[in-house]
């Protein structure tokens, strides 16, 4: 088990049904979902490890993510991302890879340390397990792509993955932004509009798919996001390992 100390937050695994249900309720609110159960739950919850970040004083959940480790790229077809993207090109990895999902924070908490703790945990896990590739689906709020045209134009221009690793289309409802958005945009403005999680991936050397999936269940647009651990700038890697 990875151990962290932070003056305001506790980061801990959800190990029992009560904690997992609390996490599912938090995810439901964070993603703005609407259903009768009031929970965001799926069949992958049984396959993933769940991590909760709590406000130490009130024990309130303020952050969450789930993850699972595969011994090689040949095993990723059983994961969440593979249900939305054709990941056959990533079977090339012959060392451990890590899938991360459902990363969310409490917007009312408004504290960047919550997301930093997510990355700190993942950085230590990557080091401990010799992970070579980190991946997942990174979401834009809502399904109206017009709000994010600048973001998609920048992703197309600067952050598409290598051709020999790009996921192919698998979902029926997709936005092929690499073919659609070619306009010049203000990079600084576009990066400010970018979801914080995706921005962090990109700043560490991450890349995205050439299309987004329109996920009506989660009320999001999401892109496949990949990060080759060897491409993370050394200074950034050292910084993450020193948090908190």
Which positions does each model-derived feature cover?
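Long, contiguous binding/interaction regions
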Residues: 233, 237
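C-terminal "cap" of GNAT-fold acetyltransferases
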Residues: 219-231
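Short, flexible loop/turn elements at secondary-structure junctions
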Residues: 15, 55-57, 69-71, 102-104, ...
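Acyl-donor binding region in acyl/amide transferases
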Residues: 73-207, 212-214, 218-220
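A structural microfeature
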Residues: 62-63, 210
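Short intrinsically disordered coil segments
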Residues: 82, 238-244
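Short amphipathic alpha-helix that is part of the acyltransferase structural core
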Residues: 1-62, 69
């Amino acid at each position: 088990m990875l151990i962290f100390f932070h003056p305001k937050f506790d980061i801990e695994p959800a190990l029992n049904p009560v904690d997992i249900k609390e996490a599912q309720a938090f995810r439901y609110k964070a993603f703005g979902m609407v259903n009768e159960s009031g929970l965001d739950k799926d069949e992958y919850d049984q396959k993933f490890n769940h991590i909760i970040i709590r406000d130490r004083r009130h024990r309130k959940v303020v952050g969450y993510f789930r993850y699972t480790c595969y011994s090689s790229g040949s095993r990723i077809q059983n994961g969440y991302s593979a249900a939305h993207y054709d990941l056959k090109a990533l079977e090339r990895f012959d060392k451990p890879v890590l899938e991360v999902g459902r990363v969310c924070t409490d917007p009312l908490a408004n504290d960047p340390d919550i997301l930093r703790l997510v990355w700190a945990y993942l950085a230590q896990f990557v080091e401990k397990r010799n992970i070579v590739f980190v991946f997942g689906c990174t979401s834009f709020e809502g399904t109206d792509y017009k709000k994010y045209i600048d973001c998609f134009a920048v992703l197309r221009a600067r952050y598409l993955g290598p051709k020999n690793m790009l996921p192919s289309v698998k979902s029926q409802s997709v936005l092929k932004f690499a073919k659609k958005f070619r306009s010049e945009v203000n990079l600084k403005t576009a990066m400010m509009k970018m979801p914080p999680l995706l921005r962090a991936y990109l700043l560490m050397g991450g890349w995205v798919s050439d299309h987004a999936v329109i996920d009506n269940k989660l009320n999001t647009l999401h892109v496949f996001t990949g990060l080759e651990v060897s491409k993370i700038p050394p200074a950034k890697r050292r910084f993450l390992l020193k948090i908190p």
